[in-house]
Curated annotation (Swiss-Prot):
It comes from Bos taurus (Bovine). Transports retinoic acid to the nucleus. Regulates the access of retinoic acid to the nuclear retinoic acid receptors. One of its GO terms (biological process) is fatty acid transport. A motif (Nuclear localization signal) lies at residues 21-31. InterPro entries: Calycin, Fatty_acid-bd, ILBP, Lipocln_cytosolic_FA-bd_dom. Its main location: cytoplasm. This is Cellular retinoic acid-binding protein 2. It holds the Pfam family Lipocalin. Sumoylated in response to retinoic acid binding, sumoylation is critical for dissociation from ER and subsequent nuclear translocation.
Length: 138
């Protein structure tokens, strides 16, 4: 079983602003979010299939607790409440499908994958826009 536990720092990000744009975040808030999210602190604690993930930026801190295969509530990257379900796609990759609790919006999901060279790859998808963020352990 992969070990996602640790404190992670970002080394690369692609399409984050495009993702926020397709989610309907206005230009001013996008600029603030992109600047704040350029150096997030990510802490992951894992016990088997149970996860705690805390992501801290200068603007916002989010915390989620979940178990693989059990639905839970969280927020989409733009802050809308949703139900999420995480499953293992492969030995080192988890996939989360999100369903908005109310209203309409783009179909959103995320994945987290550990690579053989120790990187954590987070992908966030809204409709056909994919944002990729790559982290290494601190």
């Amino acid at each position: 079983m992969p070990n996602f536990s640790g404190n992670w720092k970002i080394i690369r990000s692609e399409n984050f602003e495009d993702l926020l744009k397709v989610l309907g975040v206005n230009v001013m808030l996008r600029k603030i979010a992109v600047a704040a999210a350029s150096k997030p602190a990510v802490e992951i604690k894992q016990e088997g299939d149970t996860f705690y993930i805390k992501t801290s930026t200068t603007v916002r801190t989010t915390e989620i607790n979940f178990k693989i295969g059990e639905e839970f509530e969280e927020q989409t990257v733009d802050g809308r409440p949703c139900k999420s379900l995480v499953k293992w796609e492969s030995e080192n990759k988890m996939v989360c499908e999100q369903r908005l609790l109310k209203g309409e919006g783009p179909k959103t999901s995320w994945t987290r994958e550990l690579t053989n060279d120790g990187e954590l790859i987070l992908t966030m998808t809204a409709d056909d826009i994919v944002c990729t963020r790559v982290y290494v352990r601190e």
